[in-house]
Structures are given as structure tokens and as C-alpha cells.
């Protein structure tokens, strides 16, 4: 940031859910109005919402309308920029709702699928295609941190496979036993190979089940923990990326851990549960061969382990080609996204806090 840029911490009011739908809607409107007032009092040059999934029905469901209304209200008072987002896909009346309520916002998607959805289906005027922000280097990302992390966990560079399961079991299958047993079978298969296995959490939470819980459930089922490293503590994003960057490849249920691996030119096998994987990994970085659509319950009953093993063979047989392609494409993405962000910085400086007219 420039030296004259002020950084404020905003104390937004806590949303109070009501005892029924009507009360919850009323409380939402009151809450949104308080947020808008809070923002206005600080007189920002812009409101910038950094992506990902804030405007995806995969996570918000019917509640997406509250989020759209929130940014409609903010955009009436201040310029709003959505940078690096997956948009939708929206269906039914929500398509029109997005088109109307977000008409003043400036949107940069993180992939071509979202861009086309905005232009062709949602009829959004002010949208352009960008990239996921995770393609940039992270604060503290360095060779020093890489070697510090592998030393901490007793790892040897390029001699381990990192596995990132997810606590979002229901995104893959309604049967948690199938989910955890599939991971057990996969790990026991990989244990017979020449690599160490590292089980690493990506999302940690003190208030709900997180990836550490998923790792613990897998660990309970393993017949042998030989040659397996369990990372149990919370890690900074740069620490996660350091571990991924020193491994041979990774297998991930979390898209941003998959991106962190790819960002350092290390292959990943991404187990997809939403369209964002197709947009960001298959599309933007051009690696559809590394993505598995893993939302079919029958796969978790029988078949997912074999499909992952086929991807492992694909990586091993094409390792240099994949890593060289990744290195080139990531550099292209960084350059393009830098140009996009610099252009929007100029727009923000010229606009000086005025809301867009349309």
C-alpha cells in the first residue's frame, strides 16, 4: 500500500437470526442498513470484495438474495468492485435478481465460465474475465520458509505426496463411511510406493468440524501409519503452500490448496464438487486432466480410488511436461492479473468514492 493509504478495521454489527423467516428477513434488512451506514462513515474510495465463492449458490442457496441485496444497497452509496469471483451459476428468478441488483458493481471473474455466464445468461454490462487471486505469491512465500517447513516435519523434498481431505463430506457423498474408507484404501495403496504420505488440513475452525477432523477420521481407519506424517496444527497459507511446493504432487479436496500446488508448478489431483474447478483448473490454467468430478455417490462406494490411481499414473508418466506447462501458464496469469488490477487501481483513484451511475 502507498504510505498515505489509511487502513481501518470496521466493526460490523452481528447478524441476529429471527425465530421465523419473516423476522429473519426484517433483521437482515436492518443489519444491511447498519453495514452501509458504517461503510459510509469511513468515506472509502471504493469497496473491494475479493473473490471467491461469495456469489455462488453452491454455498448460499436461497440466502444468496440477501447477499445480492446487501451489495445493491452498498453500490447505491459507494463504488463496488468484485475481484476474482466465481459467479453463480444462477437459475430461475435469481438470474434476473443478479442482473438488477448488481448492475452498478464492476465485476472481474476468475474464469471464462463465470464471465460467459455473466455476459450471456445474466446480461451483466460491467464484467471482464480475470483470474483467481491465489495465483499470486503469498506474503512470506519464500525458499527460506519452504525449507523451514520440510525440516520441521522431517520431510525430504520431492519425496512425499500431500493429501488434503475436506470436512465438506456432504459435497461428495451422503455416506461418510464411503468417503473415509475410500481415503483409507487410497492411502494404503500409496503406502506401498516410494513416497511418504503427508495428510495436511487446509481449512481449520474452532466452531465446527474442519479438515483436522476429517484427517482424524481417516487416521482411525488406517491399519498402519507407517511412512505417514499427520499435520495437526493450524498453518498459515504460506506454510501450506511451502509444504505443497516441496512435495512431488498433491491430492486435494480443497480448490485453493490445489491452486497453491499448481502455483508452484507442482501437479495436483483435484477432486471437484463444483463448477469452480472446471473454470479455474480445467479452464484457466488448462489442466482438465488433473480434475476429477467427484460428486457421484457411486464413485465413493466403489471406483474413486482407481480413478485417482489412474491420475497418479498420468502425472508420473508426464511429470516434466506438466510442470513446465504449469510454470509457463502461472507466469502468464500473474502478468495478466497484474495488468487488470493496475487498471482498476487507476479507476478507483479517478473515481474517488463516487458510486457508479449504472
Task: List where the protein language model places each region.
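Active-site anion-handling motifs in enzyme catalytic cores
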Residues: 1-358
Amino acid at each position: 500500500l502507498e504510505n498515505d493509504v489509511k487502513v481501518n478495521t470496521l466493526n460490523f454489527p452481528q447478524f441476529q437470526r429471527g425465530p421465523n423467516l419473516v423476522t429473519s428477513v426484517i433483521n437482515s434488512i436492518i443489519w444491511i442498513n447498519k453495514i452501509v451506514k458504517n461503510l459510509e462513515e469511513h468515506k472509502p474510495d471504493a469497496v473491494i470484495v475479493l473473490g471467491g465463492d461469495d456469489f455462488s449458490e453452491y454455498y448460499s442457496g436461497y440466502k444468496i438474495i440477501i447477499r445480492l441485496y446487501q451489495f445493491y444497497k452498498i453500490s447505491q452509496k459507494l463504488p463496488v468492485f468484485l475481484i476474482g469471483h466465481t459467479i453463480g451459476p444462477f437459475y430461475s428468478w435469481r438470474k434476473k435478481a443478479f442482473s438488477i441488483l448488481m448492475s452498478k458493481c464492476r465485476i472481474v471473474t476468475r474464469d471464462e465460465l463465470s464471465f460467459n455466464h455473466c455476459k450471456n445468461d445474466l446480461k451483466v454490462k460491467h464484467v471482464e474475465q480475470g483470474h483467481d487471486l491465489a495465483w499470486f505469491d503469498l506474503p512470506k512465500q519464500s525458499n527460506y520458509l519452504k525449507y523451514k517447513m520440510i525440516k520441521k516435519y522431517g520431510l525430504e523434498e520431492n519425496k512425499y505426496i500431500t493429501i488434503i481431505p475436506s470436512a465438506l463430506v456432504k459435497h461428495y457423498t451422503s455416506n461418510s463411511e464411503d468417503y473415509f474408507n475410500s481415503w483409507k484404501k487410497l492411502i494404503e495403496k500409496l503406502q506401498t510406493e516410494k513416497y511418504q504420505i503427508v495428510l495436511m488440513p487446509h481449512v481449520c475452525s474452532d466452531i465446527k468440524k474442519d479438515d483436522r477432523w476429517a484427517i482424524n477420521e481417516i487416521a482411525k481407519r488406517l491399519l498402519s501409519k507407517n511412512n505417514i506424517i499427520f499435520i495437526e496444527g493450524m498453518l498459515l497459507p504460506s506454510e501450506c503452500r511451502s509444504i505443497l511446493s516441496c512435495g512431488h504432487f498433491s491430492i486435494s479436496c480443497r480448490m485453493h490448496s490445489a491452486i497453491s500446488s499448481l502455483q508452484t508448478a507442482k501437479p495436483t489431483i483435484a477432486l471437484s464438487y463444483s463448477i469452480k474447478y472446471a473454470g479455474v483448473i480445467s479452464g484457466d490454467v488448462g489442466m482438465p486432466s488433473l480434475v476429477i468430478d467427484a460428486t457421484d455417490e457411486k464413485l465413493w462406494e466403489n471406483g474413486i480410488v482407481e480413478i485417482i490411481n489412474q491420475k497418479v499414473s498420468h502425472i508420473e508418466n508426464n511429470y516434466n511436461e506438466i510442470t513446465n506447462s504449469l510454470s509457463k501458464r502461472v507466469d502468464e496469469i500473474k502478468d495478466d492479473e497484474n495488468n487488470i488490477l493496475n487498471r482498476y487501481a487507476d479507476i478507483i483513484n479517478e473515481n474517488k468514492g463516487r458510486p457508479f451511475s449504472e
